[in-house]
């Protein structure tokens, strides 16, 4: 009997040691399924077959610290969010806005940066909106599943400023911007981070900007233990290191 108790205690002790050596959470000790949309520079994009970006650097730093590995799957924007809701993915990141409708079906990390929403147009069109009174005269495009649609539904449409049926939806920013250049759409909604990149590549300009209404975070399935540990990591590296990563990609 004593031998059985000893062996049971020994097994329990070994299990506790093994668990402690797995990382700071069970989730962090295994391969993490990551959903992304690799057409959202500078937050997430592909270059020469390699995944890069601000969000990637933040989560890569987490995995290096915790000893986990990422298995990255690319989706369109709506598919990426769907992978989190259905729990096919453990986390999603590509410059994702934290919104109330999304918080009902997924959990978010603490915000890691503030963001603006920019309506951009081609410079040769010279569309400049002093206010939103004339917005209804233009077609607007953006990727399916973006927070802009909720904004139009809850803020603009009830005030008679813009209707959701005027919107043209696309798989990603790439297709929306192609139609913008071809004159198939008047303006495209871009995150401020994304707009900062495409201004260097395309002759676009801001037609209207919403400041202070958006914060970006990492998306997790409801009840995720990984989210809490990632938040802990963000606290551990502190605001200065987080800002250094942001500054690296926002140059």
Where in this protein do the model-derived segments appear?
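Extracytoplasmic small-molecule ligand-binding "clamshell" domains
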Residues: 27-96, 169
């Amino acid at each position: 009997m004593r031998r059985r108790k000893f062996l049971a205690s020994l097994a329990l002790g070994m299990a506790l040691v093994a668990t402690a050596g797995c990382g700071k959470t069970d989730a962090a000790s295994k391969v993490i399924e990551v959903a992304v949309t690799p057409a959202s520079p500078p937050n997430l994009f592909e270059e020469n077959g390699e995944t890069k970006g601000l969000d990637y650097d933040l989560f890569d730093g987490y995995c290096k610290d915790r000893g986990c590995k990422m298995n990255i799957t690319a989706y369109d924007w709506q598919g990426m969010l769907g992978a989190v809701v259905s729990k096919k993915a453990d986390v999603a990141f590509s410059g994702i806005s934290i919104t109330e409708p999304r918080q009902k079906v997924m959990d978010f990390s603490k915000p890691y940066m503030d963001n603006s929403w920019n309506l951009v147009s081609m410079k040769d069109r010279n569309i400049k909106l002093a206010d939103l009174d004339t917005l209804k005269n233009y077609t607007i495009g953006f990727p399916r599943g973006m927070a802009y649609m909720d904004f139009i539904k809850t803020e603009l449409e009830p005030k008679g400023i813009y209707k959701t049926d005027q919107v043209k939806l696309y798989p990603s920013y790439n297709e929306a911007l192609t139609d913008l250049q071809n004159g198939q759409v008047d303006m495209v909604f871009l995150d401020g981070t994304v707009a900062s990149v495409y201004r260097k590549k395309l002759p676009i300009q801001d037609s209207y900007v919403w400041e202070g209404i958006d914060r970006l975070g990492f998306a997790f399935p409801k009840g995720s233990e990984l989210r809490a540990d990632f938040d802990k990591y963000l606290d551990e590296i502190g605001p200065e290191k987080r800002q250094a990563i942001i500054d690296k990609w926002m140059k």
